[in-house]
Swiss-Prot record:
Record's protein name: Large ribosomal subunit protein uL2cz/uL2cy
UniProt-listed SMART domains: Ribosomal_L2, Ribosomal_L2_C
Region (Disordered): 1-33, 220-272
Gene: rpl2-A
GO biological process: mitochondrial translation
Organism: Spinacia oleracea (Spinach)
A single GO molecular function term of this UniProt record: structural constituent of ribosome
Length: 272
């Protein structure tokens, strides 16, 4: 996959880049119907700032990495419209072809493998019990056999900091420190496309292609629309602390459900 840099001909293409991407494999894609785009069955907005967007094909990603002890080769590195990380197509020795998340630094032609006693190499997947302390990992399982569920976004990386008994201690990208079964698998390395949060879209239309609608500040609304609204001119919000459009405290209040079963596995809550 090549990266094409735009010339500075217009303000919307300044500092812009686009991926010259290949067509995905037909047996690894499926159509998807984006239900509602933020609306419920009656057409009422239930999730704000969503709607529109370009039509997408879903790429089937192998989060389980259950092709054990079979070496695979990275054939392509492709753009995926359903996530901010790149994906890469793997051709395994037994003829199987699958998509996985692109590890940072992996190039076309590299070989990867998953199993119990495989080298600690970028892109390889193995159980946490076989990894040394301090290993950088991503695509981490929470439940054995369910597939990776943690650290899957672009640039995400977790760290294995301890192993004791049947559990391993991980430091997640959010700063949370929690316990996971040592038998769960993870992939060595960091997810690629690290600088995605520094990408300049250049114009509002590029944001609309992603299915994101404009965000309006509550302080410029009317009182009927938002608790911050109303007043003459540039008036303050008129409250001790900011609130959501429905009057609940915002910016700092804990929103996690109390007494969840997973509280027993969290050693230190995430940092703000």
């Amino acid at each position: 996959m090549a990266i094409h840099l735009y010339k500075t001909s217009t303000s919307s293409t300044r500092n812009g880049a686009v991926q010259v991407k290949s067509n995905p494999r037909n047996n690894l894609i499926s159509g998807q119907r984006r239900c509602g785009k933020g609306r419920n069955a009656r057409g009422i907005i239930t999730a704000r700032h969503r709607g529109g967007g370009h039509k997408r094909l879903y790429r089937k990603i192998d989060f389980r990495r259950n092709e054990k002890d079979i070496y695979g080769k990275i054939v392509t590195i492709e753009y995926d419209p359903n996530r901010n990380a790149y994906i890469c197509l793997i051709h395994y020795g037994d003829g199987e072809k699958r998509y996985i998340l692109h590890p940072r630094g992996a190039i076309i032609g590299d070989t990867i493998v998953s199993g119990t006693e495989v080298p600690i190499k970028m892109g390889n997947a193995l159980p946490l019990t076989d990894m040394p302390l301090g290993t950088a990992i991503h695509n981490i399982e929470i439940t054995l056999g369910r597939g990776g569920q943690l650290a899957r976004a672009a640039g995400a990386v977790a760290k294995l900091i301890a192993k004791e008994g049947k559990s391993a201690t991980l430091k997640l990208p959010s700063g949370e420190v929690r316990l996971i079964s040592k038998n769960c698998s993870a992939t060595v390395g960091q997810v690629g496309n690290v600088g995605v949060n520094q990408k300049r879209l250049g114009r509002a239309g590029s944001k609309r292609w992603l299915g994101k609608r404009p965000v309006v500040r509550g302080v410029v609304m009317n009182p009927v629309d938002h608790p911050h609204g109303g007043g003459e001119g540039r008036a303050p919000i008129g409250r001790k602390s900011p609130t959501t459009p429905w009057g609940y405290p915002a910016l700092g209040r804990r929103s996690r459900k109390r007494n969840k079963y997973s509280d027993n596995f969290i050693i230190r809550r995430r940092s703000k």
